[in-house]
UniProtKB/Swiss-Prot annotation:
Organism lineage string: Eukaryota, Metazoa, Chordata, Craniata, Vertebrata
Subunit structure: A connexon is composed of a hexamer of connexins.
Database matches in Pfam families: Connexin
Function: One gap junction consists of a cluster of closely packed pairs of transmembrane channels, the connexons, through which materials of low MW diffuse from one cell to a neighboring cell.
Family to which this protein belongs: Belongs to the connexin family. Delta-type subfamily.
Domain of life of the native organism: Eukaryota
Spans within the Cytoplasmic topological domain: 1-19, 99-177, 256-302
Keywords: Cell junction, Cell membrane, Gap junction, Membrane, Transmembrane, Transmembrane helix
GO terms assigned for molecular function: gap junction channel activity
Organism in which the protein naturally occurs: Leucoraja erinaceus
Protein known as: Gap junction delta-2 protein
Amino acid sequence: MGEWTILERLLEAAVQQHSTMIGRILLTVVVIFRILVVAIVGETVYDDEQTMFVCNTLQPGCNQACYDKAFPISHIRYWVFQIIMVCTPSLCFITYSVHQSSKQRERQYSTVFITLDKDKKREDNKIKNTTVNGVLQNSEFFTKEMQSDFLEVKEMQNSAARNSKMSKIRRQEGISRFYIIQVVFRNALEIGFLMGQYFLYGFKVPSMYECNRYPCVKMVECYVSRPTEKTVFLVFMFAVSGLCVILNLAELNHLGWRKIKTAVRGAQERRKSIYEIRNKDSPHRIGVPNFGRTQSSDSAYV
């Protein structure tokens, strides 16, 4: 049960800041109707699954062969594998968002340190402008130097603020895109496991199986323990998987297309701004004079 608790906390961290209301409802469905039910009820129902699978034969190995034919993979193990695989995109999203947040903090710290260093230099110049060897100095050189340092620090602060804002916008766009991608993958996994459950088990667990698989020498009848209880559990897990698929589609409809359009529009605007900056810089590049031959060198050829 401790392993499931760790998984629950990780899933809560995944949707704490970046998920929608539908995503939080989906988390409740996954945690309560899947993890808790499989961990508490499923282990009790399927505890004696193989030991109570009895066939009316004494042939060695026949019971195991017929059980393998009836249940290629145990219900409870299939659902545990389904939970792990469906939660994997959310865990990848946690890793990505934490990495982006740490990168953003590193950028902010580096900007603060550079600004503080420039402020310190400006204060040193101010002290130097005030007294030199105990004599008051008001020279124009120190005043201009201090003004240039002040303008440089101010420009750096404004540039740092703009860069921080742009990096924050890019980070939010990247997190939104990654969130949409993980919802798409999660829904694809849900549909795949739902179809796999249908083809493996159907909607009913029969009380008796007929088996003639080797090493059985003839057709034998095998009996399953708690068939009605397992049928109810099977239908319940079908319903939970179907509900998760519907919630994933609703979440994509709620934020997916809108955020996809916003992300595409933002990428187009960034490309447009870069193109405009390059066009503004191109006249300056063309108008640069050629310093290869000066006027004095030209007059030497006259």
